[in-house]
Amino acid sequence: MKEFDLESYDYYLPKELIANYPVLPKEKAKLLVYERRSQTITHTTFEHVLDFFPKNALIVLNDTKVMKARLFGSKHAFLPSKTTEVFFHRFFKDNTALTQIKGKIKVGDKIFFDENYYAEVLELLHNGQRLIAFYDNQTPLNQENILKLLEQYGHMPLPPYIKRADESLDAHEYQSVFAKHTGAVAAPTASLHFSQHGLEKLLKDFKHAFLTLHVGAGTFLGVETKDIREHQIHTEVLRIPKKSQEILQKSQEILCIGTTALRSVEYFKRLENPNQEAFECDIFLHLANPILHVNYLLTNFHLPKSSLLMLVSAMIGLEKTKEIYKIAIEKKYRFYSYGDGMLIL
């Protein structure tokens, strides 16, 4: 069936529609509103996004905070040039970390970030990840100090389709105004559309709940299996506070700010009697595993053959998704992380 064929999720996007910078002020970004019941499309801007939110809906937001996850170092302490890139993914046990390292690397290699700080490669994993430990003058760093190291020496992990180095503006623009808990290596991009003023109005006028899904590097990986149902999605760290769990259990109408919030809600609502706050979320939503508990979604425009495009198709159907994306391209909407948005009602 074509809805499970990977090629059905391909489309052509002109390069000039890939957003390399955000629209400022945020409210000026374009917004496509699709109302499923009436099959109508409205073209507007984020100045008016809250006008379209259903008044009784619970608004769910992901408050993860993006780490400065890209580090550049040298394999020799005395070399001034830093050409080896370490992409921090997540903490592992005993203050070690899972990373990607560009170039040839072997167990025991060290990567120096300055005269004191360095990382040592502990293990080469089968999936291309490298297990490393961080040190300050041979003293192992704990997680708190590793985060300080990333903040001091790291760069914002802009997506690979943004063909430029990170700049000072990315430190705050590639971060939602309600980001709170550090741990993501990619921003939950629908959240980027809210200014402080917009957030305050949302929190004042609507029921809301926060959760934390630390977006992982796997979010940039495309689906590669010919039958999308065979795809194994990446696992991400999820935390839902008890207060938010109680609100979610009681709510009948839910609007998620972004696909990460939606995946989190769908994962949680399918659990039987959850009795903890921390989870490992690995839910892959598509037409054979449809959305059951979320009614509305605010999202950006996603990459061809991506799991996120399949999620949108699970909500409105493959043909309607293709139709809307065709219209968005014709109307010169800006795509991907720094791009414009789409509200599905």
UniProtKB/Swiss-Prot annotation:
Its EC number is 2.4.99.17. Keywords: Cytoplasm, Queuosine biosynthesis, S-adenosyl-L-methionine, Transferase. InterPro entries: QueA, QueA_dom1, QueA_dom2, QueA_sf. It is found in: Cytoplasm. One of its GO terms (cellular component) is cytoplasm. GO terms for biological process: queuosine biosynthetic process; tRNA wobble guanine modification. It is an enzyme of class 2 (transferase). Transfers and isomerizes the ribose moiety from AdoMet to the 7-aminomethyl group of 7-deazaguanine (preQ1-tRNA) to give epoxyqueuosine (oQ-tRNA). Belongs to the QueA family. NCBIfam families: PRK00147.1, queA. This is S-adenosylmethionine:tRNA ribosyltransferase-isomerase. It comes from Helicobacter pylori (strain G27).
